[in-house]
Regions:
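Mature N-terminal, pre-catalytic/accessory segment of carbohydrate-active enzymes
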Residues: 513-521
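Short, basic/low-complexity N-terminal boundary segments at the transition from targeting/disordered tails
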Residues: 55-57, 61-84, 349-366, 434-446
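Residue-level detector of buried hydrophobic side-chain packing
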Residues: 17, 263, 392, 413, ...
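Short beta-strand and strand-turn-strand segments in soluble, beta-rich domains
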Residues: 444-454
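Surface-exposed, glycine/proline- and aromatic-rich loop segments on solvent-exposed faces
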Residues: 329-441, 489-498
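Glycan-processing catalytic domains of CAZymes
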Residues: 1-330, 408, 452-454, 461, ...
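Ser/Thr/Pro-rich, low-complexity mucin-like regions
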Residues: 460-506
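Beta-strand-rich interaction surfaces with strong enrichment in secreted/lumenal proteins
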Residues: 379-382, 453-458
């Protein structure tokens, strides 16, 4: 487990948040810890990306439902991060709804300066009587309840899974996430082997007492297989999207609060409700099926992140890619940088700072986490086309490292053509697997292998790579087409989705691609 002040990790998180279109994030300080060091690192990185010109998510904090704890924590948060006399640089990062005051989830402190500074929302706990003016971090009802806010209107919670068994909410059986996880089908033989004897009916009740990642509200059943599909999460989003589609403006959801990205605390507590005082239990996080993180994981990879992105786009809407007409003749672009400033050039910006070396300790403080694969920091890509060819320019922060013999992961350019099938992750071609002095290779990806189909002209000068691609090699025979692409430098593995997130630099990060849409004049 990494430490939450690992800058290498936090940079990845921020980039993913920006790509997802998140408007704000909330730090969970409900356990009365405010994570000073980690939050400062995160805020400073947000400022760095904002200064690069990116729309970064805003920030707020969520405190305890306990009034006394909340008052203390709110004051600590104000003093540590918000006090304008101490931290004026962070003022532009605070989430303010559609008014002027920064939001905070918690109780007023009694301090006039602090209380007049914030816009307060009291936290709604899922096992308490519903008060519609409060703020829901999770909802134990399905379909989820509607909450109200004077600024943003209807508010709704969307969560990955719900620990409703904590209060017997689901079927009258009191069970923690760990109880449901231990009573899952794959673990029942081990329970029997330890001398436990429960009826099949009771085992099923405990397993389904909580709503795991694969819980289906139609059948009221959990499923580990469905957990990889995110059935529960998708049904939660469906509640939001159905209200958006019904045509009634009064039903529109003004704010969706998603729980959650990750759990910074996974408490191991004594005395299992089901197995007795010889056994511990875990309330919020237990295993893949009974946990609520969206952040990437070795089992479900980026499934939940991409589901989040897709549903945010369905909720907020997304503009179509701009269409670019062919230029008369782009052949001069290979020798002249000025031509790339044309209005007919499509421009795609990537984050700077992604290639820092990782040399951190894990959360135990015992093991080092090292990643030194960062090499060429991709900053910008430009695309233009004429009747016969597509031209790409890739600009990096520093001079591009020379290609070393045998390096098949140097400045790879992955391409996908709309309407074509096969390949990998919607991409059918890759450039620069075997570049020469003046020409570079073009390979087609088929069945997790690379088949060379041609060569393309290319040049490298300083921090600029330019490539000229014959459309015929890509099977393009019309003026209207869609080109998907991504740039990756120094991947460590071929055909490995996880490697797109952790090795070298990829633009854009992870499984996503940029889109260039060409249109006839």
């Amino acid at each position: 487990y990494y430490n939450a002040d690992d800058e290498w990790v936090l940079r990845k998180h921020i980039e993913l948040f920006i790509h997802a279109g998140l408007d704000f994030i909330a730090f969970d300080t409900t356990n009365a810890r405010i994570y000073d060091s980690q939050v400062y690192t995160f805020l400073d990185l947000l400022l760095e990306y904002k200064q690069q010109g990116f729309e970064v998510p805003k920030v707020m904090f969520m405190t305890s439902v306990d009034v006394g704890d909340s008052k203390t924590t709110v004051q600590l948060i104000y003093d540590a991060f918000y006090d304008p006399s101490m931290h004026e640089e962070y003022e532009e990062l605070w989430f303010r709804g559609n008014r002027n005051k920064p939001w905070i989830i918690g109780s007023k402190t009694g301090d006039s300066v602090t209380d007049s500074y914030f816009y307060f929302k009291l936290p709604q706990w899922p096992n308490a009587a519903i008060q519609s003016s409060k703020f829901p971090w999770i909802d134990w009802n399905y379909p989820q309840d509607i909450y109200k806010d004077a600024q943003l209107g209807n508010v709704m919670s969307v969560s990955v899974s719900q620990h409703v068994g904590l209060m017997g909410k689901s079927n009258g059986t009191y069970a923690d996430f760990s109880d449901s996880g231990l009573f899952a089908p794959e673990n029942r033989a081990e329970l029997t082997g330890k001398g436990f004897s429960f009826s099949e009916e009771y085992i099923e009740k405990v397993y389904n007492a909580n709503w795991g990642r694969g819980y289906d509200h139609a059948t009221k059943q959990n499923s580990r297989a469905r957990a990889l599909e995110g059935t529960n999460f998708e049904q939660q989003w469906k509640t939001v999207l159905d209200r958006e589609k019904d045509g009634e403006a009064s039903n529109d959801i003004g704010l969706v609060f998603v729980t959650g990205w990750n759990e910074w605390i996974a408490q191991k507590q004594a005395n299992s409700r089901i197995l007795g005082d010889k056994y511990c239990h875990f309330v919020d996080t237990f295993n893949m099926e009974f946990s609520r993180d969206i952040e990437m994981n070795a089992e479900y990879l980026d499934n939940y992140y991409l589901s989040l992105v897709r549903n945010i786009r369905a909720y907020k809407g997304v503009a179509s890619a701009a269409a670019y007409s062919e230029s008369e003749d782009c052949s001069g672009l290979m020798n002249n940088l000025d031509g790339w400033n044309s209005a007919s050039a499509a421009v795609y910006r990537d984050f700077s700072g992604e290639t820092i070396a990782r040399n951190a300790v894990d959360t135990s403080g015992q093991s080092e986490l090292v990643n030194v694969t960062g090499r060429n920091d991709i900053r910008e890509i430009r695309v233009m086309s004429d009747a016969e060819k597509i031209y790409m320019l890739v600009r990096t922060e520093e001079n591009i490292t020379p290609h070393a013999a045998g390096d098949t992961h140097w400045m790879n350019v992955f391409l996908g053509i709309g309407g074509q099938t096969g390949g990998w992750q919607g991409l059918q071609y890759v450039l620069n697997k075997n570049p020469g002095k003046e020409k570079t290779s073009l390979h087609r990806m088929t069945n997790n292998s690379f088949d060379k189909i041609g060569e393309c002209n290319y040049t490298v000068k300083g921090n600029v790579l330019r490539i000229e691609i014959d459309k015929k090699l890509l099977g393009i025979s019309v003026a209207d087409y869609t080109l998907k692409f991504k740039i990756a430098d120094n991947l460590q593995k071929d055909f490995d989705v996880a490697d797109l997130y952790v090795s070298g630099d990829t633009a854009p990060l992870g499984r996503m691609s940029y889109v260039y849409r060409a249109a006839a004049k």
